[in-house]
UniProtKB/Swiss-Prot annotation:
InterPro entries: AlgH-like (IPR003774). It comes from Protochlamydia amoebophila (strain UWE25). GO terms for cellular component: cytosol. PANTHER family: UNCHARACTERIZED PROTEIN YQGE, UPF0301 PROTEIN YQGE. The lineage of its organism: Bacteria, Pseudomonadati, Chlamydiota, Chlamydiia, Parachlamydiales. This is UPF0301 protein pc1755. Belongs to the UPF0301 (AlgH) family.
Amino acid sequence: MENMPYSQIQKGTFLIATPDIDSGFFFRGVILICEHNANGSFGLLINKSLDLELPEEIVNSEHLINPYISIRSGGPVQTNQMMLLHTSSQIQQQTLMITEGVYLGGDLQFLQDAITDQNGPHIHLCFGYSGWGAGQLEREFLDGHWFLHPAELRHVFYISPDKLWQHLLREMGGKYATLSMIPEDLSLN
C-alpha cells in the first residue's frame, strides 16, 4: 500500500510522522484524524501512553475493573482536557464515529459505567489534542512531515502503542517498511 495523497486527509485516516520529524512531541507519532475541513483539522495522538493517576472524582481506582482502559497523550493543545476514544456504539447521541467501530465522545457517567464493567468497551482517555489551522496540515504534508494511512479499529485498540508507528509503515510496504527499521536513536546504529 502506498502513501495516500494529501487530498485523502479526512476523518478516519492516520497521520504517521515521517522520519523528518526526528524529535519532539510528534516524533514517531500516529495521529487519528477526527475532523478535517476547510477551517482546519483536529486529531488525537494515539501512540503516546501517559502515566497519570486520575482524580478520584473521575475514576475511583477501587472500581476500575475494565481491563481495556488506557491513558494517552492526545496532543500538545489543551493538555488538561480529556477526550474519550472508545469502541461503544451505545451512546450514539453523544459520540462521533471516526471510523468503523471507533467513536469519540461520551460523558462522565458513560466513563464511570464503562470502567466498572469487566467486559466494557476499549477506551483511550486522551489528554490534549492535535490541531491545525486552515491549510496548515496540507502544507506540512507537502513538506514531507506526514504519511497517510486508513485507520481501523484494530490499529487504534489492539496494537501496542509503542509498536504502532512501525506496524503501520510495515503495512504500507516497500520503502515505508524499510523506514520502519530505522532505530529511534541513530547513535545506536
